[in-house]
Protein backbone atom coordinates (compact mmCIF):
# COMPACT_ATOMS: atom_id res chain seq x y z
CA UNK A 1 0.00 0.00 0.00
CA UNK A 2 1.31 3.46 -0.91
CA UNK A 3 1.67 6.13 1.71
CA UNK A 4 -0.62 9.08 1.17
CA UNK A 5 0.98 12.26 -0.06
CA UNK A 6 1.02 15.39 2.09
CA UNK A 7 -1.41 17.22 -0.21
CA UNK A 8 -3.75 14.26 -0.14
CA UNK A 9 -3.76 14.32 3.64
CA UNK A 10 -4.69 18.01 3.62
CA UNK A 11 -8.26 17.13 2.68
CA UNK A 12 -8.62 13.35 2.78
CA UNK A 13 -9.31 13.34 6.48
CA UNK A 14 -10.68 16.85 6.58
CA UNK A 15 -13.25 17.27 3.81
CA UNK A 16 -14.10 13.89 2.33
CA UNK A 17 -14.45 12.11 5.68
CA UNK A 18 -16.84 14.37 7.56
CA UNK A 19 -16.23 15.09 11.21
CA UNK A 20 -17.01 18.25 13.16
CA UNK A 21 -13.80 17.62 15.13
CA UNK A 22 -11.46 18.96 12.43
CA UNK A 23 -7.96 19.73 13.67
CA UNK A 24 -4.49 20.21 12.30
CA UNK A 25 -3.43 17.23 14.41
CA UNK A 26 -4.94 14.94 11.77
CA UNK A 27 -2.54 16.36 9.21
CA UNK A 28 0.62 16.72 11.25
CA UNK A 29 1.93 17.64 14.67
CA UNK A 30 1.79 21.38 15.42
CA UNK A 31 5.42 21.25 16.56
CA UNK A 32 6.37 20.28 12.98
CA UNK A 33 4.76 23.44 11.55
CA UNK A 34 7.30 25.81 10.00
CA UNK A 35 5.13 28.28 8.10
CA UNK A 36 3.95 25.92 5.34
CA UNK A 37 1.38 27.91 3.33
CA UNK A 38 -1.13 25.05 3.00
CA UNK A 39 -1.96 25.38 6.69
CA UNK A 40 -4.31 28.19 5.59
CA UNK A 41 -6.62 25.34 4.45
CA UNK A 42 -7.08 24.34 8.10
CA UNK A 43 -7.49 27.93 9.24
CA UNK A 44 -10.46 28.33 6.88
CA UNK A 45 -12.00 24.85 6.73
CA UNK A 46 -15.41 24.75 8.38
CA UNK A 47 -16.74 22.01 10.63
CA UNK A 48 -20.39 22.25 9.57
CA UNK A 49 -21.54 22.80 5.98
CA UNK A 50 -24.69 24.15 4.30
CA UNK A 51 -24.43 21.93 1.21
CA UNK A 52 -22.51 18.86 0.04
CA UNK A 53 -22.17 17.63 -3.54
CA UNK A 54 -20.49 14.43 -4.72
CA UNK A 55 -19.25 15.51 -8.15
CA UNK A 56 -17.65 12.24 -9.26
CA UNK A 57 -16.52 8.97 -7.83
CA UNK A 58 -15.99 5.27 -8.30
CA UNK A 59 -15.48 3.07 -5.22
CA UNK A 60 -11.85 2.03 -4.97
CA UNK A 61 -10.77 4.49 -7.69
CA UNK A 62 -11.52 8.15 -6.97
CA UNK A 63 -13.82 10.70 -5.39
CA UNK A 64 -14.42 14.38 -6.01
CA UNK A 65 -16.73 16.29 -3.74
CA UNK A 66 -17.52 19.86 -2.76
CA UNK A 67 -18.95 21.33 0.42
CA UNK A 68 -20.30 24.86 0.88
CA UNK A 69 -20.41 27.08 3.96
CA UNK A 70 -22.00 30.47 3.29
CA UNK A 71 -20.54 31.74 0.02
CA UNK A 72 -17.33 29.68 0.19
CA UNK A 73 -16.88 26.25 -1.40
CA UNK A 74 -14.32 23.61 -0.43
CA UNK A 75 -13.46 20.92 -2.99
CA UNK A 76 -11.48 17.72 -2.57
CA UNK A 77 -10.39 15.20 -5.20
CA UNK A 78 -8.66 11.96 -4.21
CA UNK A 79 -7.41 8.99 -6.15
CA UNK A 80 -6.19 5.45 -5.51
CA UNK A 81 -2.68 3.97 -5.85
CA UNK A 82 -2.84 4.28 -9.65
CA UNK A 83 -3.32 8.06 -9.82
CA UNK A 84 -5.80 9.64 -12.23
CA UNK A 85 -6.63 12.57 -14.44
CA UNK A 86 -9.70 14.46 -13.24
CA UNK A 87 -11.71 17.12 -15.04
CA UNK A 88 -13.88 18.91 -12.49
CA UNK A 89 -16.75 21.08 -13.69
CA UNK A 90 -17.14 24.15 -11.51
CA UNK A 91 -20.84 24.48 -12.40
CA UNK A 92 -21.70 24.12 -8.69
CA UNK A 93 -20.34 27.67 -8.14
CA UNK A 94 -22.74 30.62 -8.37
CA UNK A 95 -23.02 31.84 -11.95
CA UNK A 96 -21.93 35.42 -12.54
CA UNK A 97 -19.47 35.45 -9.63
CA UNK A 98 -15.69 35.43 -9.81
CA UNK A 99 -13.93 33.25 -7.26
CA UNK A 100 -10.37 33.13 -6.02
CA UNK A 101 -9.35 29.47 -5.98
CA UNK A 102 -6.81 28.53 -3.31
CA UNK A 103 -5.42 25.34 -4.88
CA UNK A 104 -3.39 22.70 -3.01
CA UNK A 105 -1.78 19.86 -4.99
CA UNK A 106 1.08 17.40 -4.62
CA UNK A 107 4.08 19.45 -5.66
CA UNK A 108 6.95 17.02 -5.44
CA UNK A 109 10.57 17.99 -4.96
CA UNK A 110 10.24 21.35 -6.76
CA UNK A 111 8.32 22.62 -3.71
CA UNK A 112 10.93 23.47 -1.10
CA UNK A 113 8.89 22.77 2.02
CA UNK A 114 8.90 19.64 4.15
CA UNK A 115 5.35 18.77 3.06
CA UNK A 116 5.91 19.47 -0.67
CA UNK A 117 2.39 20.84 -1.15
CA UNK A 118 2.10 23.21 -4.11
CA UNK A 119 -0.13 26.23 -3.41
CA UNK A 120 -1.61 28.17 -6.35
CA UNK A 121 -4.01 31.10 -6.35
CA UNK A 122 -6.08 31.62 -9.51
CA UNK A 123 -9.34 33.32 -10.50
CA UNK A 124 -12.14 31.15 -11.84
CA UNK A 125 -15.92 30.94 -12.26
CA UNK A 126 -18.79 28.49 -12.77
CA UNK A 127 -18.10 28.15 -16.52
CA UNK A 128 -14.68 26.54 -16.05
CA UNK A 129 -13.50 22.93 -15.81
CA UNK A 130 -10.44 22.45 -13.59
CA UNK A 131 -8.03 19.78 -14.76
CA UNK A 132 -5.97 17.77 -12.29
CA UNK A 133 -3.26 15.15 -12.82
CA UNK A 134 -3.45 13.35 -9.49
CA UNK A 135 -0.40 11.41 -8.37
CA UNK A 136 -0.83 7.86 -7.00
CA UNK A 137 -2.60 8.03 -3.62
CA UNK A 138 -2.74 11.77 -4.07
CA UNK A 139 -5.25 14.44 -4.78
CA UNK A 140 -6.10 18.11 -4.75
CA UNK A 141 -7.94 20.50 -2.47
CA UNK A 142 -9.43 23.85 -3.47
CA UNK A 143 -11.10 26.62 -1.50
CA UNK A 144 -13.27 28.95 -3.60
CA UNK A 145 -13.90 32.46 -2.22
CA UNK A 146 -15.95 35.13 -4.06
CA UNK A 147 -13.83 38.19 -4.86
CA UNK A 148 -14.60 41.77 -5.82
CA UNK A 149 -13.42 43.23 -9.13
CA UNK A 150 -10.76 45.26 -7.32
CA UNK A 151 -9.44 42.21 -5.44
CA UNK A 152 -9.50 40.14 -8.65
CA UNK A 153 -6.99 42.50 -10.28
CA UNK A 154 -4.27 41.04 -8.04
CA UNK A 155 -4.51 37.48 -9.45
CA UNK A 156 -4.16 35.58 -12.72
CA UNK A 157 -7.09 33.76 -14.32
CA UNK A 158 -7.28 29.98 -14.57
CA UNK A 159 -6.95 29.17 -18.28
CA UNK A 160 -7.54 25.43 -18.33
CA UNK A 161 -4.00 24.32 -17.52
CA UNK A 162 -3.48 20.98 -15.79
CA UNK A 163 -2.92 21.48 -12.08
Segments predicted by a language model, with ranges:
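Catalytic domains of carbohydrate-active enzymes that cleave complex glycans
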Residues: 13-21
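C-terminal beta-strand-rich structural cap/linker in extracellular carbohydrate-active enzymes
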Residues: 121-160
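Mobile "lid/hinge" segments at catalytic clefts and subdomain interfaces of large enzymes
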Residues: 9, 22-23
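Glycan-recognition and catalytic regions of carbohydrate-active enzymes
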Residues: 29-74, 78, 109-115
Amino acid sequence: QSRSSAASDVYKRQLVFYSPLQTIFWYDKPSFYHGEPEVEWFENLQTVFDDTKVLDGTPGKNITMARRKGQEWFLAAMTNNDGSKENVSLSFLDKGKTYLAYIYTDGGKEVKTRTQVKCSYLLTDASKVMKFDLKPSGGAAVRFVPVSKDEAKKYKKYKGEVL
